[in-house]
A protein has these predicted regions:
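Bacterial N-terminal signal peptides that target proteins for export
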Residues: 2-14
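Active-site-adjacent loops and short helices of periplasmic peptidoglycan-processing enzymes
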Residues: 3, 27-185, 189-198, 262
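Polar/charged alpha-helical tracts
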Residues: 8-9, 97, 150-153, 391, ...
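Intrinsic disorder/low-complexity detector
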Residues: 9, 26-27
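Bacterial N-terminal signal peptides
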Residues: 13-22
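A general structural signal for well-ordered secondary-structure junctions
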Residues: 20, 61, 84, 133, ...
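Domain-terminus/edge residues, biased toward the C-terminal soluble/receptor-binding domains
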Residues: 164-168, 176-428
């Protein structure tokens, strides 16, 4: 029994040391790209949006053209401007040349016209659902009082505020094959800011939308999302897709940013430089793999000791074994390592009661903090003084009993001798 206890203590110390060595940096696990084929020139960035953890990266910091993904920033600034989205604006004459340039470049539009009165919210739907370049220009003009250059400057400033280091904008829509550049990593930063805006996500997650009639459009018009993964009739449709944005130009290739949410967990994905035949296949395979490979699992139970702590004033035990007061679960890959840091009470002296809280353990999964749990004992540890006192009291009690027994027999024996002497004396008479 003593050898078994010593072995458990040694094993616990070795485990604690090993775990301390492994807790260094987040993102320790390396996951292989789970898709059938991917062009080595593409940029891919998959991240767990709940804890901002990178999962897959390929050329994630490479600067490249981003086409209509530009409109994510345009929409973000529009929503952050504080303007009333239900109010109407009139398309100004100052956009005449801008609209001609968009038309000459064969850019997608919702056919806005100079002098047309439209609601801001309809411009936002046109921007994010139909990827309309004229809607982008109208939005920028509205926010910056007609100065598109000032709006572009604000786009670049906002990108820096979000931590982007490879991003530069020269126009508000990304239609032209020059200027607007970013990286998969930077676009993830912009996407996270967009995802925090409820209106953005509601609009971007819309499959189709009806634009109301205006003073220059007598009939309603229905626009359909360029994000085909929102379409149930499309082969790569996924019900976990949550909006965001598509983009395409000759130099940029097919670009895609999306969020995906399932069973309470959210991923963000950026793919740049793909092609029409593969962009949605790649996205669906990557996200399917993520939801299949990562799951909720119990990381810590309450029956296995996590660590030990030195114990004073107790000859029977040199240390106390500490257990988690409650189970701890986390979401991760089967290969993710569980590590701990401890905050233990100092100068622990017996007596220690069963269930005493003697510290905390912070639990990490693949280097990312999951939570903190109390550390408790599963038995009582009695002090030397109490043990010695109990032993002394037991010994004294035993001596008292022994003395009582001896006294009893002495009295009995003494009484018998006295009776015998009396009988002998009586016979002599």
């Amino acid at each position: 029994m003593q050898n078994s206890t010593l072995f458990r203590r040694a094993a616990a110390l070795l485990l604690t040391a090993a775990l301390a060595l492994t807790l260094v940096l987040p993102g320790l696990a390396a996951y292989e790209m789970p898709i059938q084929t991917v062009n080595e020139g593409e940029s891919v960035y998959l991240f767990n949006a709940d804890i901002d953890k990178p999962i897959l990266e390929q050329n994630a910091d490479q600067q490249r053209y981003i086409a209509s993904l530009t409109k994510m920033m345009t929409a973000l600034l529009f929503l952050e401007s504080g303007k009333d989205m239900n109010a109407e604006i009139t398309i100004p004459a100052s956009l005449t040349q801008e609209f001609k340039d968009i038309q000459n470049a064969n850019g997608s539009t919702i056919n806005l016209r100079i002098g047309e009165t439209v609601r801001r919210i309809d411009l936002l739907y046109g921007l994010l659902v139909a990827s309309a370049n004229d809607a982008a220009s109208a939005i920028a003009s509205d926010v910056s009082d007609g100065d598109l250059t000032a709006f572009v400057a604000r786009m670049n400033q906002r990108a820096k505020e979000l931590g982007c280091t490879s991003t530069s904008f020269t126009c508000v829509h990304g239609l032209y094959d020059y200027g607007n550049v970013s990286s998969a990593h930077d676009l993830a930063l912009i996407a996270k800011a967009c995802a925090e805006n409820e209106t953005y996500m509601q609009v971007a997650n819309t499959l189709s939308y009806t634009l109301p009639a205006t003073n220059l459009h007598q009939n309603e018009r229905t626009i359909t999302s360029t994000n085909l993964m929102l379409n149930p009739e499309y082969p790569y449709y996924r019900d976990y897709i949550r909006g965001m944005k598509t983009g395409f130009t000759t130099l940029a290739g097919r670009c895609y940013v999306t969020f995906a949410q399932k069973d309470g967990h959210t991923y963000g994905l950026v793919v740049l430089g793909s092609d029409l035949d593969n962009i949605y296949r790649e996205a669906s395979e990557i996200l399917d793999w993520a939801f299949a490979s990562f799951s909720d699992r119990e990381l810590v139970d309450t029956e296995t000791p996590l660590t030990t702590a030195p114990l004073k004033k107790c000859r029977s035990y040199e240390e106390v074994e500490l257990y988690a007061a409650a189970p701890v679960s986390g979401y991760g890959h089967a290969d993710d390592k569980v590590t701990f840091t401890y905050d233990l009470q100092e100068n622990i002296s017996a007596t220690v009661k069963n269930g005493a809280v003697l510290g905390t353990a912070t639990v990490y999964l693949d280097g990312y903090e999951v939570g903190t749990v109390d550390l408790v004992t599963h038995q009582e540890y009695v002090s030397d003084f109490r043990t010695d006192l109990q032993s002394t009291l037991l010994l004294m009690a035993a001596l008292i009993v022994l003395l009582a027994v001896l006294s009893f027999f002495t009295l009995v024996a003494g009484g018998g001798s006295l009776n015998l002497a009396r009988r002998r004396k009586a016979r002599r008479r």
